[in-house]
Amino acid sequence: TYRREEDGDTDAENRNRVYRLSASYGRSDNPLRVGLGRQFAPSLAVVSLFDGIYAEYRKARWAAGGFYGTEPEPEDWTWSSDVRGFGGFFEYGNAPAALRRWAVTTGAVSSTEEGEVNRDFLFVQGRYDDRKLSGYLAQEIDVNRGWRKDAESGDSLTATSTFASLRYRFGDALAVRAGYDDRRSVRLYRDLITPETEFDDTYRQGVWAGVDGKAGRHLLWGVDARSSSGGPAGSADSYTGTLGAAGLTQLGLAARIRSTRYESDVTEGWLHALSVSSDLASWTRLEIHGGFRAESPLHPAIPEGDFAWFGLDWEAFFGRHWLLSLTADRNLGAHEDNDQYYATLSWRF
């Protein structure tokens, strides 16, 4: 439930329902895996969420598969048949039990919207991981036809959507990381949306670098800097520090604090977030989280954007097959008064 103050006297209330139902089949002694319903394709990260069927055949060093389905409505995530897509992939990687783990995936995806050309593209993904170094690279190349070729000045091929990340570990206590993201559009499906996740999504595009580490048995820390451009917020710079602790007490108490300073072309401000979680018993865990964002406009025409949020997240396992998750969140300030409630029930068989 979202309740927003449209003016000083009235409220406008919206109710949204998001569903996700899927079933999959796979066995450790069978190379075939099949999924049906609303799902992500594990080897087709470029596709994001879709409603349809996915199948893959995976051997020790290679895999191949494909999908066919439709895209959900972008605004309310209901089922829609407007955008239909299909595609396939081939993956080749390291031998089993190798110390250096790597894989290269290539494939093609084609989609139409109400029978007309939507998007056709080729893609390549690569990942590498060993004891010290890990990296990921994804590149898409649009194959333009019809109106898309005219929109791209007659070019048949256009390189789009580059994403790269690199991480190097200096032992267990220190690591450095860097990345680059110029993807034009990323459809993100989240079970829970908070001002913290919205902030990170808004400033997603750009380059970043950071360092993180571990002090002692329980303390975790991190610092990073990001320069964003091309996204909905325009050009912006942000600096983030995080501090956390895990494995405290016999109940597995954990805590995390995050603070971000940001400056864009139109606003500047701070974002602070805190979460604390603990096991209530061997089969259930509770998290309390919240935060505050203070934003000051750089132009008089833009209103101030101070607001806060807080909530609870409870998970419980029932037997070997059932997982229940309940979340309640409240956002207030900056002309908003929003309540969000989520319930998820999973059954593994």
Residue ranges of predicted features:
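Gram-negative and organellar
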Residues: 1-349
